[in-house]
Design a protein with these regions (language model features):
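Terminal, charged accessory segments of proteins
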Residues: 1-173
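A short, highly charged nucleic-acid-interacting micro-segment common to nuclease
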Residues: 177-181
């Protein structure tokens, strides 16, 4: 019921939709092999490849001062990605909630109503995880809770707060608590 109240709250729903509509992005640079005619900028590394690359084409008929040039050169390619630590954290939170609800469903002493609520919550979380921005996101290698975007950016801040409440509630125990119920 606690996770259900978090997931079904308007604040959490709005936060996930804000993240989906405006996720944290970053540029990643990789090396790609391009045909020599498609290279836009020649850096120092590309110039070295022109002199060393063994896969060459004869251009002696073009009077360029060179007899051969390479067919391809490796050049840096920048790509915009949403696979950031902040988005990995949001995915981790959603999957943690989903895992918790799945565990609740498997408990033998869980009542029918509790199992039904867990199933509804799993459906909502599955819907969130199916958003296009989360399909590119990998599993987190570490949790960076001190990220400025996670603490300040709208949407991320609310998800962090919900996860902290959930995590603290999961760790909460006291002696004699069983006697109360």
């Amino acid at each position: 019921a606690f996770v259900k109240s978090i997931v079904e709250s308007e604040t959490f729903c709005d936060a996930i939709h804000k993240i989906q509509s405006n996720p944290v992005r970053k540029w990643t640079e990789t090396m790609v092999e391009r045909h020599i005619s498609n290279v836009k900028r020649m850096g120092r590394d590309a110039m070295k490849q022109i002199s060393r690359n063994p896969n060459r084409v004869d251009v002696s008929h073009m009077n360029m001062g060179m007899d051969t040039i390479p067919r391809t050169v490796k050049v840096p390619y920048k790509k915009d990605t949403v696979d950031t630590l902040e988005n990995q954290f949001v995915q981790y939170v959603l999957m943690s909630f989903m895992s918790f609800c799945s565990h609740i469903q498997t408990l033998k002493n869980a009542g029918e109503r509790l199992r039904k609520e867990a199933a509804i919550t799993i459906g909502i979380l599955g819907n969130y995880l199916s958003f296009s921005s989360f399909k590119e996101v990998s599993m987190p290698s570490m949790l960076s809770l001190n990220s400025p975007a996670l603490q300040r950016k709208e949407g991320y801040r609310e998800v962090l707060q919900a996860w902290l409440i959930f995590d603290l509630a999961a760790k909460l125990s006291w002696h004699g608590g069983d006697d109360v119920y």
